[in-house]
Amino acid sequence: MMFFKLIWRRFLKSYQNSRLHCFVSKILRALEFEGFIITYSQFGEDMILENYFRGRREGFYVDIGANRPIQGSNTFKLYLNGWRGINVDGNQQLINGFHKVRKRDISLCEIVSNSSEQVSFFVSEDDRVSTISKEFKEWIKDHRSYAQEVTMIPKSLTQILDQYLPLSQKIDLLTIDVEGHDYEVLISNNFDKYRPEVICIEDHTFSFNNINGNAICSFLFDRNYELQGYAYPNLFFKTKLI
């Protein structure tokens, strides 16, 4: 088992954005058995989400800060189950990878925020922690370095959905992972118009000792969502209005 895991990690690294990777992943997905489960996301978020949506086919996700199409993705496991959706990332090179291996999806190179003012997008050397948050960039500077700074004009999540969400399409899942700017992305959505069933959102500041004082929790509680789970650093919410 350990030997297989080592080979799989090397395969992920070598072919992470390829059609071959997608094909092999589908085969392995079909061969999953009890006690051996494949995860693609960074902290196993996709296993939590798959468990919630178990048996649901042809769902729809919106993935903000999508990063890579396979490795580290919260939504690739759902894609293999027949889902489709909208992927958004500020790195055009990463979005090109989505175009290659996730043909059913709509994949966009955009920055999402609650402000339309021009921002600097800091692209990390390993592509994993790119951000527009100067505070996050400063917080992680001892562990990651940034290779490029790109000037971009953000759009709100509502604008993205107005333009690209298929007509009458229900959003089953909204996942947000944008390295320190997650709250701003969240509040840029019009929840009266677009109401995801489940929300997975990253928050490095969350504490069980101060749930009601947490900005993300307070915002979603006010919009009739309930906190369903927490797996560092991600919060999982479900709407009460279904």
Where are the predicted features?
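Phosphate/nucleotide-binding beta-alpha loop and adjacent structural elements of enzyme active sites
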Residues: M2-I242
